Amino acid sequence: AENWPRFVLPSPALGIADRIRRHTAAGRPVWLYGHNMGGGFAVAVQEQAAAGLAPAASPDAALALHDNPERVKAQGVSITPSCPKGYAAVPLADYEPGFWDGLLSAAGLPKPSLVVAAAQDHGHHPEGNRVGRFNLWRALLTETQGDPARWLYDTSPTPCTRLNALQQCTGGPVADTATAAVLGALAAPEVAKRSQRQGVTVVNVGNSHVAAFLVFKGRILGVYEHHTGMLDTDALLFDLKEFGFGWLPDEQVRAKGGHGCAFLAPLPPEAEGFAPTFAVGPRREMLLGYAQFIAPHGDM
C-alpha cells in the first residue's frame, strides 16, 4: 500500500522525559499530574531522584510508573494530590487534544470527527506488569473466542487503566498496540486469503516486545508475547515453531523472561502448524528470510 499520509512523531513519553531532564538540569523538582500513560519517562524521573531533587506525582500519574504505590515511593517519588511549593508541574497524557488541535491547525487540516487510538496496556496488577498483561491476553482470547473484531473496544475494560485514561482523552475506540498490529495484518489481502486456507502466524516485532498470533479462518487461536531484547533470531524462531504446534508451555516463556503464551485448545490439525509467517514492526529484520514482511495501509 502506498500514499497513506501520516504524522510520525516522537512518543509523548519522550517529550515528557525531555521536560523532566530540563527541570533537573535547572535544579527544579517536578510534580507529575494528569493521566496514566506510557512510562517511557521513568528513567528521567529516576535521574531526578538520584540528583536529590525528590520528584513527586499525583495518585493517577503515579500509575504510569507502577501500579503499586510502594514501588513508586521506592523509586524516590512521593505521592501527593497537589503540587508542592517550588515544584514544576508536568502534565501526563498519551493524547493531549490541545497539542493535536494545534498541529492539525498549523497544517491546515480540520479536527477529526473520530479519534481511534492504541496503546500498550498491562492492566492494573500491583504484583507486576508481566503477570497483569498476560492475564489480560488470556481473558481476551477466551471471552471473545478469538474474534479479533471484539478486540477493538468501544469502552475499554476496567482493568485496562492506561486505555481507560486514553479513552477519557480521545472519546473514541481504543485498542492495544499488539491488537492494532494483528488487525492491520488481517487487513492485508495476502494474509486474509492465506489464513482462510491454512493457519498463519502474525508477528509484531516491536522495539520492546514481540507479540505473535496464530490466525485461522478469521479467528485468533493463540497469543505469545516476549521482550525483544531477550531474544535473538534463533530463540524467536524456536519459540514460534513450538508455538505454532501448540507445544510451547506458558511456564517456559515466563521462565525465560517473557510474558507468556496461551491457546484456544485444541488447535485444529488443518491449520498445519501455522507455518506461513507474516512480520510487521520496527524490529522485523530479526525474521529476515524467515517471514514475509508486510506493510498494512503503508505501515510496517
What positions do the PLM features span?
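A broad structural signal for short, well-ordered beta-strand segments within beta-sheet-rich domains
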Residues: 112, 209, 219-221, 274
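A beta-strand-loop signature enriched in Asp, Gly, Thr, and Trp
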Residues: 213-245, 252
